Amino acid sequence: WYSGMFAPNIKQEPISHHHHHHHAHHSYHQHPHDSNSNSNASSPHQSPLPSPNPPSNTNLQLEQYLKQQQQQQQQQQQQQQPMDTLCAAAMTPSSSNNDQNSPLMPPGLPNPMQSIMPANLRPSPTATTTTTPAAAAPTTTAATIALQANDKLQALTPPMDVTPPKSPAKSQQSCAEREKEHDLMSNSSEDMKYMA
C-alpha cells in the first residue's frame, strides 16, 4: 500500500493533487474504503505497469548504490593510503625515472635488477682485473658506465614496460578494479546479509 501510494506520489508530480485527493477522501469519509480500493486498484493495476516497480526498484538500486558509494568511500579511505602510495609509487617512477633513477626508482623494480645486474657484471670486471689491472680501470669504468647505462635502460625500460606508462594506468586500474571487485563482493555479501 505504501509503495502504491508512494509511487504515484513520486511518479506524477501531483503531490498537491495527491494531497487534495487524500483530503477529498478524508472529507468523504470514504477514506479507508476508498484509499483501500484505490491503492488496490493502483497497486495491482500499476505493479504490472512499471510504476511502483521503478520506484521500488530504483529505491532498491538507489539504496544499493548509496551503500556502494558509502562503501567505496570507506574503501577509498582505507585504501587511499596503501593505494595512494602504490599508485604514487607507480606514478613517480615515470617522472623520477626520467630524472635518471631518482631514489624513488621503484624499490620493487630495479633494485632486484640492480642486484642482479652488478652480480652479472661483477664477474666481468673481476675477470678483467685478474687479467690486467690496467685494463681493469677502463673495464670498471666501462662496467660502471654500462651499469649506469644499463641502469638507465633498466630504469627506463623495465619500468617503462612494467611501471610508467602501463603501470600507473594499470595499477590505478587494478586499484579501481580491485576496489570495484571488492566493492561488489563485499556489497553482494552485505546485500545478502541485508536481504536475508
UniProtKB/Swiss-Prot annotation:
Residues 125-144 have a biased composition (Low complexity). Keywords: Developmental protein, DNA-binding, Gap protein, Metal-binding, Nucleus, Repeat, Zinc, Zinc-finger. Residues 176-196 have a biased composition (Basic and acidic residues). GO terms for biological process: segmentation. Its main location: nucleus. The keyword Heme does not apply. Residues 92-103 have a biased composition (Polar residues). Belongs to the hunchback C2H2-type zinc-finger protein family. This is Protein hunchback. It comes from Drosophila silvestris (Fruit fly).
